[in-house]
């Protein structure tokens, strides 16, 4: 096994067609889950988290997968419309557990619709946040950060962990960095918020996709000039800014985590190909942020 519980992936060998051209057996749901967990080792996940197969038969074949941030109705609609065999989301369907999957609420209806359509559902949450090439690494890459390293290293593998911190190629004004970050993130109605002096010079940048309140102190201790994250609440943000740097860039939860999906799709396709299999991975562009319109307030 590799670091943080990443093990080898055992797949069935290729079969032969009439002794001539090789014909590959399709991957199974279990195979794709194994590839996913090789890319995002479960050992990197937080103790409170939920990762892995949510519904579906592990033995069913998989030729196409759809990657998305949230397992919501719109994503299920897209999966059924595309006719994919499996959906992989970043967020779990039942993070806090459940005592039923009856089709009496939206989550239960999603489960029933997926099962009726023969579509499996799996997820990789904080394991993907922390992994090499995961959400935080993708954010750092989009900003061109040099020497990116974990902001909060994993106990199991310090080379991986939640968040990343690195340096820009050269110092810039905060407002100019904000413009570049806004262009690097997928479009969503709330856009990007800036906290701090827009004309301040910044060079060391910390990033963490999704809710980042818990990493404000870590970003400061690491010497970041600016911290890009999402879901910053009023009191933690104002208390933090009262204490000085890092300045804050606050995107949306969906936008800051969506950036991890295209690299994951490429890794899954490549990993299947290395094993003589074919897998088509699509990335959903359905915006699952809850906010659909932003209006400026005041006169």
Predicted regions and their residues:
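Hydrophobic structural segments
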Residues: 7-299
